[in-house]
């Protein structure tokens, strides 16, 4: 890693990143395979359980790969022999996976260094580490959204052509061989046209090369948000130096400059005045984003117009305006990070008395609420074969061959993870129903394995069976308040947000 930093420091003055020679270094693939960049603090999170090839790394295979690349016959061999296993015991696309992993590891370096340098200048590294949890978004919602009026529910459009992804990287990395190699990946895998596909409100990814996929997707999303950042920086009284990278990009103003002038009615400063809104907030996770404001519906329509026109002229594809929904908080609920959130208006009357006169004062309070969406969650549990489409628990036959302890541990872990993730719910009834489904599904699976009834099996296990499904908070409260006979749901009315959740739960991600 230090060698990479030294190399890039020398080339930074030329604003060029010649990354292609790194592909011929053996340790690149060891670094990519072992996820060394993630361990050392890479900005791109990748689940360790997602892997496209055998976890056992072989230096011999890497040397053969490097040799074939030097001989300039790898491209021909990969095209003619893409469906055959190259080595016994390894996946058929091992070479392509290794190169894509190495390419992703190399191309991450300039972006990682740029982010690290910007954080060092602003001295925000400890702050950014504390806010890595996606649960940190919801306390922000609690503080801000109750004072706002309108919200735009935005689905970031997906690229219609993979060449768009190459052009995005071209604005940041002026290394033609590396970009040609990326194009080769796209042409070799015919099914990569489904690299980014629309699936409800989220994006689906192929799992063959997850590191490269996530990097390309993050780059694309940053480009989609560039118009938002650009306008906010230009409209700010305190100009930030972080808007500098926009000036370095070769095609930014050529592509959208003229179109922006038309939209702004030849007066850019008057248009920027519309965006000087101190009560506007923007939050995004994956392909779903929220734009909220305290100002009028007209301003939100202006933002929608700018987003749609920018996506059309900059990415050369038609962006459906229906992907941006503008609504009032008082009568709208939006899905975000697996929660169904809203800001309802609660009217109340307060009686006031002054001397002999008394009168009623009508007041309105707004409170941010987060609810577990039970119907989509039942759909996710049904797809995972924990219940049927009606929410009735069923046994999971594929786990019936495991030991009793493994079955209970798996169900208990899923239940605790969901309880941990949905700990910030305002109303716990839906969460208790999900836990009931998982507990009874576990009991049915064990009863199926032992060819017994659920009632008989629960009587034999007793309370020890239920303890596996308790969260740490429930165990602590049961020790502190052992004599209180109130049911558990009365003890958990307060929302709890955790700072150790760095990605969305898999079952929740089906929403």
Curated annotation (Swiss-Prot):
GO terms for molecular function: RNA binding. It holds the Pfam family Intron_maturas2. Disulfide bonds: none annotated. One of its GO terms (biological process) is RNA splicing. GO terms for cellular component: chloroplast. It is found in: Plastid, Chloroplast. Keywords: Chloroplast, mRNA processing, Plastid, RNA-binding, tRNA processing. It comes from the Eukaryota. Usually encoded in the trnK tRNA gene intron. Probably assists in splicing its own and other chloroplast group II introns. Belongs to the intron maturase 2 family. MatK subfamily. This is Maturase K. It comes from Anchomanes difformis.
